[in-house]
């Protein structure tokens, strides 16, 4: 009865006015999807043994009691399990998505109905997106978070840019061309007009941030090098049980899921161009080859290029590949990987997509403003662009994450690895005082995350004898590898 009453109570608030600092308990697409979301969350919990083990281990001691956790991370079913783990460990949580297309509306509804403040829906505008981020950063009484779960670094960036603007408002008037930066500056101007010290107060209370993805980690290291980082950070992305699993095995399954749901195209026999051969690129390349595609790889790093070649992939430049490919996938985390001059030369109905965090790997803006271009929307997140010469390309998810924009992202099991790391990082940051720097979780915790997932898939681990451990200079219980070991 309580659950039904809660659902009815919440429903009346959906899609009300969007004042700068809202008093809404949540904002989602459709709260009536909560029951559907709850059923899928129940299924996902069985596939996420790491998170469930942390609930069992820390449920009574509640190491996050008193923590105000703000999350900016794809609002999916798997993320719902993470959120409810943080709550079970004692935290007060507010959440938004880190991508305008990645929210699963039934997951957001289920979390909202459970009493967590979530501001996310699939198909947000960029203005909506930054408004949602602001709401997630705004706890009761105008307080900010004590710890942050970030994916891509946008929550961290909002605080840092806002902080800088309070010192020098002119930073918000600098010329920017990316629409997301334009909208960020616009909302920060409104915040500054209302409260000229907000971000200084918020930053002072943040004990740290744990960052999920490569792009966000790059931002953190850059701020640290420039002396601008305002609080400690954990680089979760480079934990072995994240980068070598989520990035590799997750993409190996979710890329094909996104492409097929969007286009129903036959991959076998196609030429697929994978831009980048890091962990994400490796997963994507092997995925496409497993479907029977001929895979071409582009790379700037000679080591990664050699790895690709030794795996049997043809390593070429985009200048050559753009004329040959049927499907293009960017995986680099860099800008301008597929330029408009490449798209001009592509085959008719070439499929172009991205599985890196931001849409700037593909020159989407240049495509939209190309003289004489004609856009035809096929269905949500699938657009066909006709060039004046008659050929067309199909852009998926508007150049944003194809696996989350056109499908539901990585499977639950592999996300349990990543989110177990996130939870451990949150416990560390909240309970210990770190100097301002960028850190990684220690090796023994990385191994523990892996260990928590072995039983689920039937793994039986061999145990070292004391003599064997002494011979190679490790403890019987680990860690088993040096920090520099590359796996």
From Swiss-Prot:
Q: Which gene encodes it?
A: ahcY
Q: What is its main location?
A: cytoplasm
Q: Where in the cell is it found?
A: Cytoplasm
Show the SUPFAM superfamilies listed in the entry: Formate/glycerate dehydrogenase catalytic domain-like (SSF52283), NAD(P)-binding Rossmann-fold domains (SSF51735)
What EC identifiers does the entry list? 3.13.2.1
Q: Which cofactor does it need?
A: NAD(+)
User: Which pathway or pathways does this protein act in?
Assistant: Amino-acid biosynthesis; L-homocysteine biosynthesis; L-homocysteine from S-adenosyl-L-homocysteine: step 1/1
Q: Could you tell me which InterPro entries the record lists for this protein?
A: Adenosylhomocyst_ase-like_sf, Adenosylhomocysteinase-like, Ado_hCys_hydrolase_NAD-bd, NAD(P)-bd_dom_sf, S-Ado-L-homoCys_hydrolase_CS
* Protein name per Swiss-Prot or TrEMBL: Adenosylhomocysteinase
What keywords are assigned to this protein?
Cytoplasm, Hydrolase, NAD, One-carbon metabolism
Q: Name one GO molecular function term.
A: adenosylhomocysteinase activity
Sites where the protein binds NAD(+):
213-215, 247, 276-281, 299, 334, 355-357, 403
Instruction: Describe how the cofactor binds.
Output: Binds 1 NAD(+) per subunit.
Entry-linked SMART domains: AdoHcyase, AdoHcyase_NAD
Which organism is this entry from? Answer: Bacteroides fragilis (strain YCH46)
Q: Which residues bind substrate?
A: 76, 151, 212, 242, 246
> Mind naming one GO cellular-component term on file for this protein?
cytosol
Family of the protein in this entry: Belongs to the adenosylhomocysteinase family.
Report which reactions are catalysed by this protein: S-adenosyl-L-homocysteine + H2O = L-homocysteine + adenosine
Instruction: List the NCBIfam families hit by this protein, alphabetically.
Output: ahcY (TIGR00936), PRK05476.2-3 (NF004005)
Its function, per the record, reads: May play a key role in the regulation of the intracellular concentration of adenosylhomocysteine.
Task: Mention one GO biological process in which this protein takes part, according to its record.
Answer: L-homocysteine biosynthetic process
């Amino acid at each position: 009865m309580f659950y039904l009453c809660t659902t009815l109570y919440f429903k009346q608030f959906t899609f009300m006015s969007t004042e700068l600092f809202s008093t809404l308990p949540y904002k989602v697409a459709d709260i009536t999807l909560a029951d559907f979301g709850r059923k899928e969350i129940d299924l996902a919990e069985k596939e996420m043994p790491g998170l469930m083990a942390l609930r069992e281990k820390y449920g009574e001691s509640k190491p996050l009691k008193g923590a105000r956790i703000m999350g900016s991370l794809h609002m999916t079913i798997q993320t719902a399990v993470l959120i409810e783990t943080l709550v079970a460990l004692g935290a007060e949580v507010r959440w938004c998505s880190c991508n305008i297309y990645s929210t699963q509306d039934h997951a957001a509804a289920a979390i909202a109905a459970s009493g967590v403040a979530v501001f996310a829906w699939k198909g947000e505008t960029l203005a909506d997106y930054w408004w949602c981020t602001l709401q997630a950063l705004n706890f009761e009484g105008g307080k900010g978070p004590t710890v942050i779960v970030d994916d891509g670094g946008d929550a961290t960036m909002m605080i840092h840019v806002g902080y800088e603007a309070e010192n020098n408002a002119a930073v918000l008037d600098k010329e920017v061309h990316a629409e997301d930066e334009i909208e960020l500056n616009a909302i920060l101007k409104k915040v500054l007009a209302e409260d000229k010290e907000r971000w200084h107060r918020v930053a002072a209370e943040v004990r740290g941030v744990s960052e999920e993805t490569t792009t966000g980690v790059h931002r953190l290291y850059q701020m640290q090098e420039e002396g601008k980082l305002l609080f400690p950070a954990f680089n979760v992305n480079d934990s072995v049980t994240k980068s070598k699993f989520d990035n590799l095995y997750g993409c190996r399954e979710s890329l094909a899921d996104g492409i097929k749901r969007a286009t129903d195209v036959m991959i076998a026999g196609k030429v697929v161009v994978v831009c980048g051969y890091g962990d994400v690129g490796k997963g994507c390349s092997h995925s496409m080859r497993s479907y029977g595609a001929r895979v071409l790889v582009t790379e700037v790093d000679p080591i990664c290029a050699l790895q690709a070649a030794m795996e049997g992939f043809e390593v070429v430049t985009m200048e050559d590949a753009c004329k040959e490919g049927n499907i293009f996938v960017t995986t680099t985390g860099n800008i301008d990987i597929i330029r408009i001059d490449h798209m001009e030369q592509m085959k008719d109905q070439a499929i172009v997509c991205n599985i890196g965090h931001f849409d700037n790997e593909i020159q989407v803006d240049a495509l939209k403003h190309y003289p004489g271009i004609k856009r035809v929307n096929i269905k949500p997140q699938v657009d066909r662009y006709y060039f004046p010469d008659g050929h067309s390309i199909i852009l998926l998810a508007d150049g944003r994450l194809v696996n989350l924009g056109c499908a539901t992202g990585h499977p639950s099991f592999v996300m349990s690895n990543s989110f177990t790391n996130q939870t451990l990082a949150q416990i560390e940051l909240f309970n210990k005082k770190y100097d301002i720097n960028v850190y990684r979780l220690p090796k023994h915790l990385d191994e523990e995350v892996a260990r928590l997932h072995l039983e689920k898939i039937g793994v039986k681990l061999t145990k070292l004898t004391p003599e064997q451990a002494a011979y190679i200079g490790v403890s019987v219980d680990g860690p088993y590898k040096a920090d520099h070991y590359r796996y």
